[in-house]
Amino acid sequence: MEKIWFQNYPKGSEKFLDTSKYESILDMFDKAVREHPDRPAYINMGQVLTFRKLEERSRAFAAYLQNEFKLQRGDRVALMMPNLLQYPIALFGILRAGLIAVNVNPLYTPRELELQLQDSGAVAIVVVSNFASTLEKVVFNTNVKHVILTRMGDQLSFGKRTLVNFVVKYVKKLVPKYKLPHAVTFREVLSIGKYRQYVRPEISREDLAFLQYTGGTTGVAKGAMLTHGNIITNVFQAKWIAEPFIGDHSRTRSAILALPLYHVFALTVNCLLFLELGVTAILITNPRDIEGFVKELKKYRFEAITGVNTLFNALLNNENFKEVDFSALKLSVGGGMAIQQSVATRWHELTGCNIIEGYGMTECSPLIAACPINVVKHNGTIGVPVPNTDIKIIKDDGSDAKIGEAGELWVKGDQVMRGYWQRPEATSEVLKDGWMATGDIVIMDESYSLRIVDRKKDIILVSGFNVYPNEIEDVVMLNYKVSEAVAIGVPHAVSGETIKIFVVKKDDSLTRDELRNHCRQYLTGYKVPKEIEFRDELPKTNVGKILRRVLRDEEIAKRPKH
């Protein structure tokens, strides 16, 4: 497709990015440390971690993995923790050891964790003690041989560390009992690792950096193989958007990092972009605690914040949020789900800063398109493809869509994954001659901006997290009182979408509460259906396939538009 969207690029901005500056993420890391050794890299719970300390501790972590665990290049290491200082230390330690990082949602149920560890073949895992009991239940069914255990406050000063760990365990009782007798502690790893020799591996752009798990219409989680080159390219593409706002490298700038780092949007557009820009990332461990989050925001004059619609909306609905100092705020980025017009308008009215909306998918590291910086207000589009990205819009008949016509968005660029881990058939379904089928139906309007009109996939998007209908249905069908079940996403004012399940009973005694409690045993909270409707029968095709779209259309028709 001719790159007519270049007309929307800001005047003087680059249309092609030279990303050859780095051969690997390690090179990008080394440059950041070299240029800003004493600048704060991360702040969490008031504790500062400078770039120099990050280098020292991640090197010790890498040396321990190389010498004590004897891990070999290409081995997979899982990370299961919220936003703590331990995360970047472990992440860069894993990458610096030549290993592959596997991000795990710490809220996973034992079943979900087991499936991901089995599929990735991870041989080691770093887990925070709050979720160690989940790991204990499944670790012996996986390839995991080494467990590194950390506590919430482990990277804080002695007094604060002691207090935080005590409160978390004994006052708030957030650490269920567990038994992992062969685990080593995070602090042990660092104290021993600093006396071990670190050998810097030769890493190329083609080497894998991450197995980032996503899903599909089959409901089976798949590991997107993201290389060092994929990530570097996407960091430069994100930098193209952010640098005009916060590009003054000569001084310390700060950004709020509330999205979980195990999510690909936060990983690339926050963690690694801010590393490249030399920006101080203020880690928010529990953004669901809005009162605590706002209290933390009041402590800083921050230049940037990233979030999803749900998060921006929750902040705006908090009375104390208006007391935050927004005088330095230059960049607000929304991703993961559509930003609602009402939220964008209220955000600008309060902060004086527009939300720049981005669009992407895990398989593309994730950034594909964004509203350019010269768009002065939220316009409901996903903007234009970022530099070094080709797109085509294909109609159902296989022909190219014209301006104003709907079709499936296909993407090509160096940010596109190598494929799905050990799933060649699934890879061939979405990757053809370097082109990635997004599954999203889009229109390019007369201003050459892209607008999503539908999702070809049946994925449900809850607060920026993908939920796969077949996974929900499989869990519901485990209940012996259920005859048939089908899950859909329905519009929700706060989370974008929520899950509704339609059920045909096998036993009339089945209740909604009973079914919800059943689901909670197997599914993370955001995957548990919020709405349950019992029906005598479900709409089907002549061959007996349930018509999910019929149910979705019925729901959309009877609900107010948000």
From Swiss-Prot:
Pathway membership, UniProt: Lipid metabolism; fatty acid beta-oxidation
Enzyme class: ligase
Gene Ontology terms for molecular function: ATP binding; long-chain fatty acid-CoA ligase activity
Keywords associated with the record: ATP-binding, Fatty acid metabolism, Ligase, Lipid metabolism, Magnesium, Membrane, Nucleotide-binding
A single BP term in Gene Ontology: fatty acid beta-oxidation
Membrane topology designation: Peripheral membrane protein
Annotated InterPro entries: AMP-bd_C, AMP-bd_C_sf, AMP-binding_CS, AMP-dep_synth/lig_dom, ANL_N_sf, ATP-dep_AMP-bd_enzyme
PROSITE patterns with a match to the protein in the record: AMP_BINDING (PS00455)
Similarity remark: Belongs to the ATP-dependent AMP-binding enzyme family.
Protein name: Long-chain-fatty-acid--CoA ligase
Natural source organism: Haemophilus influenzae (strain ATCC 51907 / DSM 11121 / KW20 / Rd)
